[in-house]
Amino acid sequence: MSSREAYVDKIKAKIDAWNADIEKMQAKAKEAEADARVNYEEQISEMKAQRDEAEKKMKEARDASESAWSDMRAGFESAWDSISDSFGKAMKRFQ
């Protein structure tokens, strides 16, 4: 398995975990009072945006040639770290 394939697999696994987290938050939002529900919905929207950005980066990495991947890897990793950090911050607001 190439480093690019391993990277894509890692991102896919994280996105799957995020999807599960989003589903949990949506269930909590349905049970929340009206004021709290608005806050949940805002956070869920932010989390979905981060997930969508991660999916976009995963597709770019998957579609890149091996030579292009070598040149793009540092940029992808930096973007991934930023997306992951933002998602984590949104999740912490619920705890």
Per-segment meaning from a language model:
Residues R4-F94:
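Amphipathic alpha-helical membrane/lipid-surface binding segments
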